[in-house]
Amino acid sequence: MELLLPHPSNSTPLTVLGFLDRAASVYGDCPSILHTANTVHTWSETHNRCLRIASALTSSSIGIKQGQVVSVVGPNVPSVYELQFAVPMSGAILNNINPRLDAHALSVLLRHSESRLVFVDHRSISLVLEAVSLFTQHEKPHLVLLDDDQENDSSSASDFLDTYEEIMERGNSRFKWIRPQTEWQPMVLNYTSGTTSSPKGVVLSHRAIFMLTVSSLLDWSVPNRPVYLWTLPMFHANGWGYTWGTAAVGATNICTRRVDAPTIYNLIDKHNVTHMCAAPMVLNMLINYPLSTPLKNPVQVMTSGAPPPATIISRAESLGFNVSHSYGLTETSGPVVSCAWKPKWDHLDPLERARLKSRQGVRTLGFTEVDVRDRKTGKSVKHDGVSVGEIVFRGSSVMLGYYKDPQGTAACMREDGWFYSGDIGVIHKDGYLEIKDRSKDVIICGGENISSAEIETVLYTNPVVKEAAVVAKPDKMWGETPCAFVSLKCDNNGDGSVPVTEREIREFCKTKLPKYMVPRKVIFQEELPKTSTGKIQKFLLRQMAKTLS
């Protein structure tokens, strides 16, 4: 058997781009994208439009070459969805960028990525023009205007050589899209959200994206023809892979610019939404909406990011949201760990079920291995739910590396064959992983390691608390002490007439936490600072805490 070797017939590179060809064949007449009353596409139309854009990018008039970077600055609108396929189909590397960045940060990413072309949503025109004004004429990328649901022509649009629909008209729907020569070929360049440090460029291969996407569909048991609501930004880890996954199952993609409670509830009711992904912030927003009522039909929700407190999951499920929890990083292409549900948990009380769901879980089907290693010895910690260590990964969807940063790559992709996440966690007796904190979020008070996430979980059980984040505050005697930042619900204690005090919050924590874990300081804010994907920006809170010392 040793003479049986790989052959071109059995070793074609894995890529998600073929999902669109199949969707056009199997689900051609089915709706692919719904946005406004005037934007309804079928999978055949979406396939046709993506091929036209890919063809236009490679034309002599635009001249994008294989391996060059093409950036997209826009929200969850149809053109941005199409570009998730069209850009890599042209042989270029897809680079989604957060449209809520400021001009300086955007210019840094465009320069670092060496982007040759930028697709720009019409509401981000001034932002992008300010960013590229910092470039020399030779450095400036080609700009193409995305005009989804644009009502009025903008005077700034004259700075754009092309519009999306114009270059599509020039494209060829019979274009033979450019398949990767190897599945290890880069497909996307994503920048980390920068909640703890400067953003890093994460390069992901066709293989990584394929394995992540298929695993996500299997792990969530996504059926054929679901109705998927885009509340998760497509620019955030490519919408965790569902930008391509929805094509694999012939889903109807419901696109929306606005992500607020009234809009979400309205779209769920109007389109009979079955699935959506949401950061814990969005769940928190939905459960605190004063006019919320139980859903007519259950909606499957996948959440990821900061560990959602059990109370938020429990309240969401009481409204009809069936919450699943996953965990991953930009560097792992998206979620690679999920809280796989066990039938024996069905009979537990709602809060206990929610507590189990708030754990991160076990590796997804397409991933190889997840472990928790002692940071001093490098050995696996005991599976006792108590022994903490750093969470490490290895599997097909781990990044190729950080773009132009070999030192940063070597620091986390180490010679022992593991990717080191920087997250702190435990493994329970049943083998399920639970994050305790980011390594930078652990508070060392008098030599004791304190998990900020544990304190936050307690704070969320207080009925007046809407948002909570705990960081280290420098202390001359103890080194560091816990400092809590809290925002309150609008109705406060019921009628809003009685203010909540710092002492009351601390006394509440004393009933549920050891004394050394009780926040020494509580700061009230109307809203905690967040990234556009809902992550609380703890580095800003740390800076505030330092000024209190």
Curated annotation (Swiss-Prot):
A Pfam family hit: AMP-binding
Gene Ontology molecular function: ligase activity
GO BP: fatty acid metabolic process
Keywords: Fatty acid metabolism, Ligase, Lipid metabolism
Signal peptide positions (record): none
EC top class, as a word: ligase
EC number(s) given by UniProt: 6.2.1.-
Family matches, as InterPro entries: AMP-bd_C (IPR025110), AMP-bd_C_sf (IPR045851), AMP-binding_CS (IPR020845), AMP-dep_synth/lig_dom (IPR000873), ANL_N_sf (IPR042099)
Source organism, top-level taxon: Eukaryota
Keyword Transmembrane among record annotations: no
UniProt keyword Lipid metabolism, yes or no: yes
Tissue note: Expressed at low levels in roots.
Stated family: Belongs to the ATP-dependent AMP-binding enzyme family.
Chain's role: May act as an acid--thiol ligase that activates carboxylic acids by forming acyl-CoAs.
PANTHER family given in the database record: ACYL-ACTIVATING ENZYME, ACYL-ACTIVATING ENZYME 10-RELATED
Protein name: Probable acyl-activating enzyme 10
